[in-house]
Structures are given as C-alpha cells and as structure tokens.
Amino acid sequence: MKRTFQPSNTSRKRTHGFLVRMATKNGRLVIKRRRAKGRKRLSVSIATK
C-alpha cells in the first residue's frame, strides 16, 4: 500500500504558500494569528541556496 504522504515542494507551496494565504480573508487571518503568536515561519517557504 502506498503511504499517504508523498512529499513535493511544488504542491506544498501551491497549497500552503504565503501568496495562497494572502489571497483569501481566512488565509490572511492565519498569517495574522501566526504573527501574533510570534512564529518564525508564517507560511511554508522552501529553503533555497
């Protein structure tokens, strides 16, 4: 049986990325909550060299 988590940076970014969050009202609320909580990472960001 195939495992449920098949990692892919592309789909990860397209679903949970910053621009996707900012596109909707609720997404902006997510960012706002994470800012208030003091999260280091507000959304998924793929580390690049």
UniProtKB/Swiss-Prot annotation:
Cysteines paired by S-S bonds: none
GO MF annotations, alphabetized: structural constituent of ribosome
Family, per entry: Belongs to the bacterial ribosomal protein bL34 family.
Keyword Nucleus: no
Record keywords: Ribonucleoprotein, Ribosomal protein
Listed name of the protein: Large ribosomal subunit protein bL34
Gene3D superfamilies: 1.10.287.3980
GO cellular component terms, semicolon-separated: ribonucleoprotein complex; ribosome
UniProt cross-references to HAMAP family, sorted A to Z: Ribosomal_bL34 (MF_00391)
Superkingdom of the source species: Bacteria
PROSITE patterns to which the protein is assigned, alphabetical: RIBOSOMAL_L34
Lineage per the UniProt record: Bacteria, Pseudomonadati, Thermodesulfobacteriota, Desulfuromonadia, Geobacterales
GO biological process: translation
InterPro entries in alphabetical order: Ribosomal_bL34 (IPR000271), Ribosomal_bL34_CS (IPR020939)
